[in-house]
Amino acid sequence: MTNLLARFDGPIVMIGFGSIGKGTLPLIERHIAFDRSKFVVIAPDDSNRHLLDERQIRFIKQAVTKENYRELLTPLLTGGPGRGMVVNVSVDTSSVDLMELAKDLDAFYIDTVVEPWPGLYTDKSLSISQRSNYALRESVLDLRRRRPGGVTAVSCCGANAGMVSWLV
């Protein structure tokens, strides 16, 4: 059953394919018209790849890291006509860095929660407050202050209730 509510012509890159990615994908299919050849899922674990293969959606088995995210994501978000979109449903990927890249590429961005690169929470060289969720929230607000305007980025929309619930 489909109930198309929108059309998206650009590339869509979903980062992560755990429980939220698996729950969100069928809802995107139900409500958003998109070109499957421009949809790609990136995740370090391919245990659910069969769900993408049966939908003819491209899969890249790779972790998105601080060292590779620009090189990995830029061609995926700029390949072909239309503005790109990042759907970040992963952990251990810096939401702020990914938002900033999306902004650089004039791509939309959405995530369920603000995340840091691995190691922030356990970095003893930082104070407890510098390792807190409050500090992560402030880093998103700082990005907004430093780079006002531009294409929309939605952060911390939640998962379920949140991103999944919006589309049900």
Predicted regions and their residues:
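Conserved Rossmann-fold cofactor-binding substructure of NAD(P)-dependent oxidoreductases
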Residues: 64-80, 94
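NAD(P)-binding Rossmann-fold cofactor-contacting core
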Residues: 33-53
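N-terminal Rossmann-like NAD(P) cofactor-binding module of classical short-chain dehydrogenase/reductase
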Residues: 83-88, 109-110
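Conserved anion/nucleotide-ligand pocket segment
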Residues: 150-167
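Rossmann-fold NAD(P)-binding glycine/threonine-rich loop
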Residues: 93-108, 112-151
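Glycine-rich adenosine-cofactor-binding loop
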Residues: 11-26
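A short, basic/flexible loop-to-alpha-helix module at the beginning of a structural domain
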Residues: 1-10, 74
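Rossmann-fold cofactor-recognition segment
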Residues: 53-68
